[in-house]
């Protein structure tokens, strides 16, 4: 896990939600990177969120898919400057999850504001917590956003769609010569 992926912002948002006595759990899945496990767990202790936050380390393939299947919402508060087009968001919408993320790189191409999820201000735990709380308290809307995200994935982001777009681009280049 990397600090620039918004880990500490999400932990702070979880602390805000815990103080409001909201019932939720937040699961972190990802390789330990510039954040040591000890530091991560000391933040959890500092915020008093042991009961609602868990970390599982790196998971791949079907092991990672289990976590998407168990989730009702995906949160990605990144401010990583090389975020380009995060595959993890495509994986989340493919599984029918509403997403909350930041306006970094190609994220606005994946998340349609208010339709497939929400785009929030970077490093703002209060706004992030508000959006998470809103979707937890509105599960039907959260589910509809997830369905809209899955539809968008099938319309724009499958391997077949990618291959067809690439083929069209290459044909256009050949025609231009």
Give residue ranges: language-model regions.
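Acidic donor-binding loop of glycosyltransferase active sites
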Residues: 69-84, 97
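A short, well-ordered alpha-helix in the C-terminal region of glycosyltransferases
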Residues: 127, 134, 141-156, 162-165
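Glycosyltransferase donor-sugar binding loop
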Residues: 25-39, 58
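Nucleotide-activated donor-binding/catalytic signature segment of Leloir-type glycosyltransferases, i.e.
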Residues: 38-59
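A conserved mid-protein helix/loop that constitutes part of the nucleotide-sugar donor-binding site
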Residues: 2-16, 83, 126-127, 160
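Short glycine-rich donor-binding/catalytic loop of glycosyltransferases
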Residues: 79, 97, 101-108, 122-123
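Short alpha-helical donor nucleotide-sugar binding micro-motif in glycosyltransferases
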Residues: 58-59, 66-71
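Conserved acidic donor-binding segment of nucleotide-sugar-dependent glycosyltransferases
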Residues: 113-114, 118-125, 134-140
């Amino acid at each position: 896990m990397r600090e620039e992926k918004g880990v500490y912002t999400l932990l702070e948002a979880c602390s805000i939600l815990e103080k409001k006595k909201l019932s939720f759990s937040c699961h972190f899945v990802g390789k330990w990177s510039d954040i040591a496990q000890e530091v991560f767990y000391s933040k959890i202790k500092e915020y008093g969120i042991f009961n609602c936050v868990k970390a599982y380390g790196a998971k791949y393939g079907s092991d990672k898919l289990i976590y998407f299947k168990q989730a009702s919402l995906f949160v990605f508060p990144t401010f990583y400057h090389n975020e380009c087009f995060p595959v993890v968001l495509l994986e989340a919408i493919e599984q029918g999850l509403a997403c909350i993320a930041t306006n970094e790189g190609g994220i606005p191409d994946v998340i349609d504001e208010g339709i497939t999820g929400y785009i929030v201000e970077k490093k703002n735990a209060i706004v992030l917590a508000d959006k998470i709380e809103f979707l937890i308290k509105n599960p039907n809307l959260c589910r509809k956003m997830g369905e809209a995200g899955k539809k968008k994935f099938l319309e724009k982001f499958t391997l077949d769609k990618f291959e067809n777009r690439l083929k069209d681009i290459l044909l256009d280049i050949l025609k231009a010569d």
